[in-house]
């Protein structure tokens, strides 16, 4: 910002990043406020189909900026949407034990658990829950560790049934054919690993920057900033389900859209929107 160099961010999701008045920061991905809204839309729609079965929530988050912002956003949304938060637990990001946290959640047994955890702590939570015989009725995660490329292989049956928000899944290739083409290119350089959430978002951010540079016809930072402020990319050129890429005055993409996917038989399956 001080140097006047545009920064196109494809992956970071803290809502605060586009509330600080930056003029050179452009975020392509949905932020956690938008992802949290998606989670509550899912719960509301689930309740319509299941006689209001979901009433109580548990919020579990690591205590760095991302986890704290996510937990705070979810807590505010719960109050707004009239859900009762029976536990809101923050834990140290590099903790080696979650025994007491899991015991508290088990005692309250919320209808939905909303965790915001990085990879090692997501593994730790599921292993601890298994050890202490706690099985959340419904777990809807804020991405991160729950979409790590090694998550399913590492956790095996413990991952089954986990739901997580995401802006990408390879099964969307049925409606977004470009995913198949890009995934084939990606696998050539990844040792055969499929494209996943974070690389897909990074790719989308990079391509938005590339298009802005083409529009600017220059690598001059001010010209690129102006191009980014005016860019309007349609969904037909994207590998994510966004409606496009167009930045608001705060630098946030105004055409984002996310999905929820669930681990079923060792694979991520898109389950929402229904």
Name the predicted role of every residue range:
Residues 1-274:
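Extracytosolic ligand-binding ectodomains
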């Amino acid at each position: 910002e001080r140097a006047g160099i545009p920064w196109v961010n494809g992956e970071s999701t803290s809502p605060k990043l586009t509330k600080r008045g930056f003029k050179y920061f452009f975020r392509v991905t949905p932020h956690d406020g938008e992802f949290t809204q998606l989670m509550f839309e899912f719960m509301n729609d689930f309740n319509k189909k299941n006689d209001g079965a979901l009433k109580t929530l548990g919020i579990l988050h690591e205590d760095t900026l991302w986890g704290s912002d996510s937990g705070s956003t979810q807590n505010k949304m719960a109050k707004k949407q009239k859900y009762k938060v029976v536990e809101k637990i923050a834990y140290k990001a590099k903790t080696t034990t979650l025994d007491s946290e899991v015991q508290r959640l088990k005692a309250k047994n919320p209808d939905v658990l909303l965790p915001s955890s990085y990879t090692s702590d997501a593994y730790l939570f599921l292993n601890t829950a298994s050890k202490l015989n706690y099985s959340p009725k419904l777990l809807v995660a804020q991405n991160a560790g729950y979409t790590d490329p090694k998550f399913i292989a590492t956790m095996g049956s413990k991952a089954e049934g986990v739901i997580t928000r995401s802006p990408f899944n390879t099964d969307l290739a049925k409606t977004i054919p470009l995913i198949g083409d890009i995934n084939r290119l990606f696998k050539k350089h990844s040792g055969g690993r499929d494209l996943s959430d974070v690389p897909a978002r990074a790719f989308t951010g990079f391509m938005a920057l590339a298009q802005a540079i083409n529009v600017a016809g220059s690598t001059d930072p001010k010209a690129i900033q102006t191009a980014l402020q005016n860019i309007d990319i349609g969904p037909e050129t994207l590998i994510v389900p966004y409606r496009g890429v167009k930045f608001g005055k705060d630098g946030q993409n105004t055409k984002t859209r996310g999905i929820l996917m669930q681990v079923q038989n060792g694979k991520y399956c898109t389950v929402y929107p229904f």
